[in-house]
């Protein structure tokens, strides 16, 4: 099994190109199921999760052609309504086919999802929303079974602004009869990107980026060409790395509007963050100031940056508190950071970090996607050589991460 080895103590400098956003690409690729004809998607990252959803779409009857960062999909032959456990268990975002299948084929049978081991992450709001659109929903033998002879618009309030729930209901509502109003929806840039795609296809989605979406159903959607937005979490990871190593890094194609919460916290920590025409430049310096963080739905501080920012705080001056309000059980990486010498204690949904002078290299184990990124960051400042095991997690969400860090001057390599 692969492992990543990081030699600590190097300052990062130079430019790094941000890949397309996985969390935007997955629902956008799933949305191709709504359309007959060839859709062409550009700037698609080459990641394990992208490969997985490609296999799932092919299983459902779509044709999928891949050429580097371009993927073409034709769902004219869509015929299968079941997303089997063998595929869905690899990635919880597979549940995104639920809405499109219900809208196109009037039924869907999707295995309950897998992916990162971060708490329960239930899909009850997806299902309740589909019921309000007129579908019948049953849970049987580990599968969600949905049937809907005709979807009709409804006024739906989400108890929490679930991202995948918002996306599933947006896609289903586009082909429903009448007007659907979705309230308390997710406001992430990936939601805005999906709305842009659906509107390009001929859908009528209004309000993306606000708490309320209004979707007027149409008879059919049309195939399009579409470019995936840059990955704000990958960008944020490199921004933290620059601040952490006293580096000077231009993160190319990072979108400042997508990263305002992180930019604010990095500046409070003492980094210089400059918004440039082609990206975001971060210059780090020490001592790092301690900063408190509370994860919140967008535009708040993203939960997917919590683990990386925690590493920055491990050698900050003073005490900082990170409160996790989105997912339970998202401090699994803490025990690995403690093995490297970090002083972190957990109390309910908060981590209290007391800054130490330095971290020490140790063999560590990645437990989920963002935790594995945080361990690479910790290795960048640790004394000695850090070995990170179970790095298949990182391949689900970061494209060529060791090459990108290496081109910035880090000593990061993969050993098979």
Curated annotation (Swiss-Prot):
Q: Which UniProt keywords apply?
A: Cell cycle, Cell division, Cell shape, Cell wall biogenesis/degradation, Cytoplasm, Peptidoglycan synthesis, Pyruvate, Transferase
Pathway listed for it is:
Cell wall biogenesis; peptidoglycan biosynthesis
GO molecular-function annotation terms?
A: UDP-N-acetylglucosamine 1-carboxyvinyltransferase activity
Leading EC class: transferase
2-(S-cysteinyl)pyruvic acid O-phosphothioketal modification, residue list:
116
User: Magnesium: is it a keyword of this entry?
Assistant: no
Q: Which Pfam families match?
A: EPSP_synthase
Catalysed reaction(s) here are: phosphoenolpyruvate + UDP-N-acetyl-alpha-D-glucosamine = UDP-N-acetyl-3-O-(1-carboxyvinyl)-alpha-D-glucosamine + phosphate
The record's GO CC annotations read: cytoplasm
Q: Which residues does the Swiss-Prot or TrEMBL record annotate as the active site?
A: 116 (proton donor)
Question: Keyword ATP-binding on this protein?
Answer: no
| Annotated UDP-N-acetyl-alpha-D-glucosamine binding sites | 92, 121-125, 304, 326
Q: Which InterPro entries match?
A: Enolpyruvate_Tfrase_dom, Enolpyruvate_Tfrase_sf, MurA_subfamily, RNA3'P_cycl/enolpyr_Trfase_a/b, UDP_GlcNAc_COvinyl_MurA
Localisation per UniProt entry: Cytoplasm
Where exactly are the transmembrane stretches of this chain?
A: none
HAMAP family from the UniProt entry: MurA
Family of this protein: Belongs to the EPSP synthase family. MurA subfamily.
Role noted for this protein: Cell wall formation. Adds enolpyruvyl to UDP-N-acetylglucosamine.
What name has this protein been given in UniProt?
UDP-N-acetylglucosamine 1-carboxyvinyltransferase
